[in-house]
């Protein structure tokens, strides 16, 4: 197997964007290949032993990619599936992206039996890692840490969540919020159209910014993520809010410190969240050795399967080779019987000798090409056993 790899470790997002390929053109060009493209990586997975045997490889700028071969390529793929090669260690999204890449290749009929087995084993390994270890537990982004903190302290099920802001920081919490069983999500933003768009994505409702005080009275959890140059939430504005958790992930801050004086308000800032995220990331990294053990186990199982597959393929090819030799010798024998006045017994004798001679000649050539002494001795031993068996 061969993998061409370009990822966030070597390129920024805009540079990776230039390396992305059109999927339709890719699958029109390449056989036995899978294209894996995310915002942080572009990887091409080939079922091939050398670059020279890949038809269409000249269409790829190989200098832009790191190239992995054989066992190293397979191990890398398993690490990718487990989230060990991700920017955020253990993230779940890559597993879904790998599945989708596999399904696309399968749909196009561009995947060999061997490559399919390797990909499915990688996906299975990624699933095992997430079930048997804590590699994907705990929010490690500011957005997911905000949601995790709210859930730990107050619980999210059946709660009303107010999201203030609809910019980049607000988008950090969207995915994490979607997965929770929240009673209602309200989005407030100075530009109502942006609030409306975000609310639609979250299955919530949008309000105009002048309705913020009213929304604050009903909210159990407030996540503030505006791009305002000055605080928008202070003690005076929140004095009638009741028991509320406020999570401020804006930079600069959306909240003032005097909010902490209110007995029913629990305020957490981006600094608190950063500590949560860093602690969670540390815990994930502690799980890496356990994941690597799972990878080793699954690689060993895959090796056993691939060895068996290679053996079955070799036997099939050997059978085809013998059949081809047999057909040629049969045709020769038929011509002799037709054109020459020779006894059938003699023709059959000549036919069997010619068949054996041809096969023995090619077996000798195989022995001559074996460079590994142990392999040579093993083959010689087995052929000797075969010879002794036929004497009895």
Swiss-Prot record:
Pathway connected to this protein: Porphyrin-containing compound metabolism; protoporphyrin-IX biosynthesis; 5-aminolevulinate from L-glutamyl-tRNA(Glu): step 1/2
Active site: 39
Keywords: NADP, Oxidoreductase, Porphyrin biosynthesis
SS bond partners: none
Species for this entry: Methanocaldococcus jannaschii (strain ATCC 43067 / DSM 2661 / JAL-1 / JCM 10045 / NBRC 100440)
Lineage summary: Archaea, Methanobacteriati, Methanobacteriota, Methanomada group, Methanococci
Enzyme Commission code: 1.2.1.70
Reactions performed catalytically: (S)-4-amino-5-oxopentanoate + tRNA(Glu) + NADP(+) = L-glutamyl-tRNA(Glu) + NADPH + H(+)
MF GO annotations: glutamyl-tRNA reductase activity; NADP binding
Function: Catalyzes the NADPH-dependent reduction of glutamyl-tRNA(Glu) to glutamate 1-semialdehyde (GSA).
Binding site for substrate: 38-41, 86, 91-93, 97
Chain ranges passing through the membrane: none
The protein, known as: Glutamyl-tRNA reductase
């Amino acid at each position: 197997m061969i993998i061409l790899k370009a990822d966030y470790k070597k390129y920024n997002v805009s540079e990776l964007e230039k390396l992305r390929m059109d999927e339709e053109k890719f699958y029109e060009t390449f056989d036995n290949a899978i294209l894996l493209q995310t915002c942080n990586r572009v990887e091409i997975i080939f079922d091939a032993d050398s670059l020279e045997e890949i038809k269409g490889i000249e269409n790829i700028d190989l200098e832009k990619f790191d190239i992995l071969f054989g066992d190293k390529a397979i191990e890398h793929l398993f690490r990718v599936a487990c989230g060990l090669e991700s920017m955020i260690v253990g993230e779940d999204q890559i597993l879904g992206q790998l599945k989708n890449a596999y399904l696309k290749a399968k749909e196009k009929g561009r995947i060999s039996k061997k490559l399919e087995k390797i990909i499915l084993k990688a996906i299975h390994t990624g699933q095992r890692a997430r079930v048997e270890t804590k590699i994907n537990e705990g929010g490690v982004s500011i957005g997911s840490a905000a949601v995790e903190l709210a859930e730990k302290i107050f619980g999210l099920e059946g709660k009303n969540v107010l999201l203030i802001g609809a910019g980049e920081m607000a988008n950090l919490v969207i995915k994490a919020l979607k997965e929770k069983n929240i009673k209602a999500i309200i989005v407030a933003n100075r530009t109502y159209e942006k609030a409306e768009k975000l609310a639609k994505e979250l299955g919530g409702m949008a309000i105009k910014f002048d309705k913020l005080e009213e929304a604050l009275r009903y909210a159990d959890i407030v996540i503030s993520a505006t791009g305002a140059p000055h605080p928008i939430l202070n003690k005076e504005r929140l004095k009638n809010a009741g028991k509320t958790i406020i999570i401020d992930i804006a930079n600069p801050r959306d909240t003032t410190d005097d909010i902490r004086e209110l007995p029913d308000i629990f305020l957490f800032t981006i600094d608190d969240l950063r500590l949560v995220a860093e602690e969670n990331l540390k815990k994930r990294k502690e799980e890496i050795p356990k994941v690597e053990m799972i990878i080793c186990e699954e690689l060993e199982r895959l090796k056993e399967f691939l060895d068996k597959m290679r053996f079955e393929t070799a036997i099939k090819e050997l059978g085809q080779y013998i059949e081809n030799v047999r057909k040629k010798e049969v045709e020769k024998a038929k011509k002799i019987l037709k054109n020459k006045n020779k006894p059938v017994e003699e023709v059959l004798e000549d036919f069997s000798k010619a068949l054996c001679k041809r096969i023995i000649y090619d077996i000798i050539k195989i022995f001559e090409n074996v460079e590994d002494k142990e392999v040579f001795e093993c083959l010689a031993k087995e052929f000797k056993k075969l010879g002794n068996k036929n004497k009895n």
